[in-house]
């Protein structure tokens, strides 16, 4: 009679690649009161040798690749190693205990495992004194899951994982493996199809098209403890973000700078230009360069295009040591259809949302995530926490939030299924975003979250406790659209579009806003910022300086995509570096210097950032001069209502040696910034000392200018400020109110 481990059914499942419980059959099994037996499976092997406590013994051969060796009772996994066909001598994977526990299962299947990145995927560890790599994956509909790699000849029958929960978690410890080992998952689906998949929880990947997962050893020694300790204090400070695509900021010898090369250069540049943060277009792994990183396949992995896992850690560490925060673009709304990654992961739409007639998103032809599954939410939440914990990022900007919030986003009637109340809101996505923000803010105070949200969905930046989504900031897409729409108009037509400047103030304090001029506005035929400006070269550059000054003065945090600060002429392309040679041209030098000094003024002026989400930080002075395109307003810090900045923007092309503004009673007025400075390439006008006029004198000036009739008694008289107003310029004054 054959021993139990040769049970025909067990062996058939093992040999056919459908065994879900290899740990029950293989490893050290008890044979009697006095004897154990080591049972091995080596498909294709004729002989197998075992080193047992220093002595080499040949295992007994059975049928179908099963080998065994009788041993004394109480043998341990450390006591023996097995010779493989490639000559490798290693401990037996099936002799070691399984570590995925009930608490892991409870938290993961509830969607609340906050350290899932230390449990799932390939985790280097030591079990019973033996080093190796523990592999864990979620594939509930697979009949068999194996880890394949160079270490087993990419043979799917050699290392099948053990199904450790009835909800589809699989585990195996492979002794002797170290960082750098390449691997993938091989799965047998319910229908018998064999799939080869990259690891959704993989921490690093080889380059496309192979896209193998790579084991990493996270042993980087950080030097940013002082930054992390002080980070929470910086959240209410100035925020001037430089948006960067790593692969096209600067090149060397025809290739993009890698993470390490970029680190010092970009950090010094940001300090020189007075940026407080960089925001990186996604550096998560992605197969397609042209997606700019927004079609992610490695949610836990930095892209290998620009260096190693440790190289990106070095980059972030270096930025912190120079006082620059790092924000990461992150895409939890959709993922690509590439068959090697998450799509149809275990033979079923495991991560995909399937309730709509077509599972593909009409805008990007990608899959959307199924937020109704706790495990999918845990996967995404774990990704965000991984980047904060292991990579020390200071903020996460969530891409395409609108597409997550609405079931009908980009879809016509009949192409989507309403929620259980008959509405269009994705209730599961809303719950996920609330969980995302709640966990991050509780676990990592000082880390900021940003929503790129283009609709009027309410309470984006209201706390979860008050019924909001809980983001720290929302991108003000309406302000960006209206502002650029106005600037693109030729000067004679601007008076008909004055509302583009004034309307955004009606909702400017309904959320905590960030004002972006992002990468999306300088691609796909939209033209660069300088290319949007009407007129000849002088007027274009004057308008760009005016635009940058306007952004700095408006209430809200700031973001500018790389190249905008020096007037990049061509549209951005991810396949080439910025046109840095333009800085040899005076116009570009001028706008670059202007941007630098505007940034410096911003970070040094609490009136521009200290209370920029409160209505009390902004007060109109005048927006009635539609014909000449002049608007003026005051900006306040919450500490001193008498100290303010007066911001004056002239969107026209005329020059006014004497321009009279109605103003509150002033004690003093001093010019701080003039974008028409000759150092910036301007005409040098606007530097005459402003004159503060009493109501009586101001009225006389208005009568003389024909602004009011002599017998006009409508409304009270107000003080006036007589300034020299240059063409197409921003003027910023420091004023003290009476």
Swiss-Prot record:
Q: What class of enzyme is it?
A: transferase
Q: Reaction(s) catalyzed by this protein?
A: Transfers a segment of a (1->4)-alpha-D-glucan chain to a primary hydroxy group in a similar glucan chain
Q: What is its EC number?
A: 2.4.1.18
- Molecular function GO terms recorded: 1,4-alpha-glucan branching enzyme activity; cation binding; hydrolase activity, hydrolyzing O-glycosyl compounds
Entry keyword annotation includes Glycosyltransferase:
yes
Q: Which GO terms describe its biological process?
A: glycogen biosynthetic process
Active site location: 399 (nucleophile), 452 (proton donor)
Question: In its keyword annotation, does this UniProt entry include Transferase?
Answer: yes
Named in its record, the pathway it takes part in is: Glycan biosynthesis; glycogen biosynthesis
Which of UniProt's keywords are assigned here?
A: Carbohydrate metabolism, Glycogen biosynthesis, Glycogen metabolism, Glycosyltransferase, Transferase
Q: Which GO terms describe its cellular component?
A: cytosol
**Tell me, how does this one assemble?**
Monomer.
Q: Which family does it belong to?
A: Belongs to the glycosyl hydrolase 13 family. GlgB subfamily.
Functional summary from the UniProt entry: Catalyzes the formation of the alpha-1,6-glucosidic linkages in glycogen by scission of a 1,4-alpha-linked oligosaccharide from growing alpha-1,4-glucan chains and the subsequent attachment of the oligosaccharide to the alpha-1,6 position.
Its protein name is 1,4-alpha-glucan branching enzyme GlgB
- Native organism: Chlamydia trachomatis serovar L2 (strain ATCC VR-902B / DSM 19102 / 434/Bu)
Encoded by which gene? glgB
């Amino acid at each position: 009679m054959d021993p139990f481990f040769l049970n025909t059914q067990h062996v058939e499942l093992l040999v056919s690649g459908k065994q879900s419980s290899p740990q029950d059959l293989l490893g050290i099994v008890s044979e009697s009161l006095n004897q154990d037996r080591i049972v091995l499976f080596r498909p294709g092997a004729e002989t197998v040798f075992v080193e047992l406590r220093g002595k080499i013994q040949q295992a007994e051969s059975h049928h179908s690749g099963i080998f065994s060796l009788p041993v004394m009772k109480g043998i341990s996994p450390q006591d023996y190693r097995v010779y493989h066909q490639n000559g490798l001598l290693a401990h037996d994977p099936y002799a070691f205990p399984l570590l995925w526990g009930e608490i892991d299962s409870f938290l993961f299947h509830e969607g609340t495992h906050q350290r899932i990145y230390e449990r799932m995927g390939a985790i280097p560890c030591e079990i019973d004194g033996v080093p190796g790599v523990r592999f864990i994956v979620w594939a509930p509909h697979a009949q068999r899951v194996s880890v394949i790699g160079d270490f087993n000849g990419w043979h799917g029958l050699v290392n099948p994982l053990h199904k450790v929960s009835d909800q589809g978690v699989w585990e195996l410890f492979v002794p002797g493996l170290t960082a750098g080992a390449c691997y993938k998952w091989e799965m047998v689906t319910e229908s018998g199809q064999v799939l080869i998949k990259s690891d959704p929880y993989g921490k690093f990947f080889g380059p496309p098209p192979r896209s193998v997962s790579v084991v990493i050893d996270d042993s980087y020694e950080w030097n940013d403890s002082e930054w992390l300790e002080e980070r929470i204090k910086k959240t209410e400070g100035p925020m001037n973000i430089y948006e960067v695509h790593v692969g096209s900021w600067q090149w060397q010898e025809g290739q993009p700078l890698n993470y390490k090369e970029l680190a010092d250069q970009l950090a010094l540049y940001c300090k020189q230009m007075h940026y407080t943060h960089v925001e990186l277009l996604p550096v998560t792994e992605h197969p397609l360069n042209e997606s700019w990183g927004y079609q992610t396949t490695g949610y836990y992995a930095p892209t290998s295009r620009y260096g190693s896992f440790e190289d990106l850690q070095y980059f972030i560490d270096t930025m912190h040591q120079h006082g620059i925060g790092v924000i990461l673009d992150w895409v939890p709304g959709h993922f690509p259809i590439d068959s090697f990654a998450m799509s149809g992961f275990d033979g079923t739409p495991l991560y995909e949302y399937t309730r709509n007639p077509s599972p593909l998103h009409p805008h990007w032809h990608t899959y959307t995530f199924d937020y109704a599954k706790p495990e999918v939410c845990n996967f995404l939440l774990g990704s965000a926490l991984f980047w904060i914990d292991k990579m020390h990022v200071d903020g996460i900007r969530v891409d395409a939030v609108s597409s997550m919030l609405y079931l009908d986003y980009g879809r016509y009637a009949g192409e989507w299924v309403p929620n259980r109340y008959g509405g269009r809101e994705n209730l599961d996505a809303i719950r996920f975003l609330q969980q995302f923000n709640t966990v991050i803010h509780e676990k990592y105070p000082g880390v900021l979250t940003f929503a790129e949200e283009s609709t009027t969905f309410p309470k984006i930046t209201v706390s979860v406790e008050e019924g909001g989504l809980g983001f720290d900031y929302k991108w003000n897409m309406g302000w960006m659209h209206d502002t650029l729409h106005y600037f693109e108009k030729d000067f004679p037509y601007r008076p008909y579009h004055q509302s583009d400047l004034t309307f955004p103030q009606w909702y400017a304090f309904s959320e905590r806003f960030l004002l972006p001029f992002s990468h999306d506005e300088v691609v796909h035929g939209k033209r660069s910022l300088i290319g949007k400006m009407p007129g000849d070269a002088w007027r274009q550059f004057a308008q760009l300086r005016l635009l940058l000054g306007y952004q700095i003065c408006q209430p809200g945090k700031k973001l500018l995509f790389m190249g905008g600060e020096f007037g990049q002429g061509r549209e951005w392309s991810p396949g080439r570096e910025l046109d840095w040679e333009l800085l040899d041209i005076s116009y570009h030098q001028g706008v670059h210097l202007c941007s630098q000094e505007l940034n410096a003024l911003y970070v040094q002026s609490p009136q521009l950032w200290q209370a920029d989400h409160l209505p009390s930080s902004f007060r109109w002075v005048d927006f009635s001069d539609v014909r000449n395109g002049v608007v003026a307003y005051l900006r306040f810090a919450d500490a001193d209502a008498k100290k303010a900045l007066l911001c004056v923007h002239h969107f026209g092309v005329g020059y006014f040696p004497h321009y009279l503004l109605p103003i509150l009673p002033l004690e003093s007025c001093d010019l701080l910034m003039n974008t028409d400075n000759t150092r910036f390439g301007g005409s040098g006008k606007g530097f005459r000392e402003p004159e503060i006029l009493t109501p009586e004198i101001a009225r006389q000036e208005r009568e003389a200018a024909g602004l009011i009739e002599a017998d006009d008694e409508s409304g009270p008289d107000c003080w006036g400020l007589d300034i020299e107003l240059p063409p197409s310029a921003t003027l910023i004054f420091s004023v003290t109110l009476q």
